[in-house]
């Protein structure tokens, strides 16, 4: 197995090459507070290119945002190319829900709303990417997103590139 440093260097070079060939200035990553978004955003920051970290809470209590906020503060302290925005999407989500018809299928309704949250976040990531000439970077790992398929189509799966797509969850934790 390749050393973690070699994998890290390869991904950083790949991100830089991808951005350069795409004529893009940097990256935008949605920060959830989980290990995958922490690793992905750190790798993007290590490229030296501009990185925008977006926190996009939807119906979340403040203590659910602590890990994402701490990680972003750490990134901003360590890397000068990092900036962040917290974009509260509660009102957008509420507005969308207010025009939906009643559903008698409670489980399907809840799953649909969970996927809607992911799609609102994806739209927000692409808004900021277009404004800044950035690439939207996915945080999916090999097992969850690209093995099991645990993602929302046209939501958190709707990205320009996925730098940790070949890394297992075990490797992510290392």
What is each stretch, according to the model?
Residues 1-152, 161, 165:
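ATP-dependent adenylation/nucleotidyltransferase module used to activate substrates
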Residues 168-174:
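Metal-dependent de-N-acetylase/amidase catalytic core
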């Amino acid at each position: 197995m390749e050393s973690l440093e070699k994998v890290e260097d390869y991904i950083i070079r790949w991100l830089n090459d991808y951005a350069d060939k795409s004529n893009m200035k940097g990256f935008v990553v949605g920060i959830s507070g989980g290990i995958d978004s922490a690793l992905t955003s750190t790798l993007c920051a290590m490229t030296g290119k501009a990185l925008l970290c977006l926190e996009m809470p939807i119906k979340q209590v403040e203590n659910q945002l602590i890990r994402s906020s701490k990680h972003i503060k750490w990134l901003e302290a360590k890397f000068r190319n990092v900036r962040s925005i917290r974009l509260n999407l509660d009102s957008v989500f509420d507005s969308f829900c207010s025009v939906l018809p009643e559903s008698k299928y409670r489980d399907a309704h809840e799953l649909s709303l969970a996927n809607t949250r992911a799609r609102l976040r994806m739209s927000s990531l692409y808004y900021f990417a277009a404004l800044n000439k950035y690439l939207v970077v996915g945080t999916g790992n090999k097992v969850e997103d690209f093995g099991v398929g645990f993602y929302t189509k046209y939501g958190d799966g709707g990205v320009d590139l996925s730098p940790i797509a070949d890394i297992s969850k075990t490797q992510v934790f290392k």
